[in-house]
């Protein structure tokens, strides 16, 4: 597993210190997570939405071009980052409604977590 990118570490560090990460920090962390997901699961069959920050298409299969995608995953930024570092499991996110997924290939559990959860923070 990879070490988390600096943007994800900054986001987690802000949370650890008890201050909510600002919008720019959150956006940078979301973009870093999505970039790694795109790298690991290239394709256009699933749309992953993290409003209001970004949406990407990933996983090989039937390409989505217009309208409602055949497979859709939507979640909030904190939940995406928690999935990426392993502090939220895919099944738990689905069960409690933090992750909304529908359609063929929308199960992203095989790609998560992305990063080593043992993040080392500066003192």
PLM regions: where:
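Feature captures hydrophobic
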Residues: 1-123
């Amino acid at each position: 597993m990879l070490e988390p990118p600096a943007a994800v570490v900054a986001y987690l560090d802000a949370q650890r210190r008890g201050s909510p990460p600002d919008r720019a920090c959150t956006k940078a962390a979301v973009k870093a997570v999505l970039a790694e997901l795109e790298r690991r699961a290239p394709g256009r069959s699933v749309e992953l939405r993290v409003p209001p920050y970004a949406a990407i298409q990933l996983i090989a299969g039937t390409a989505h071009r217009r309208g409602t995608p055949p497979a859709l995953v939507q979640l909030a930024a904190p939940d995406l980052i928690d999935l990426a570092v392993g502090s939220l499991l895919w099944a738990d996110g689905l069960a409690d409604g933090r992750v909304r997924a529908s359609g063929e290939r929308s199960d992203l559990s095989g790609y998560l977590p992305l990063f080593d959860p043992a993040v080392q923070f500066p003192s």
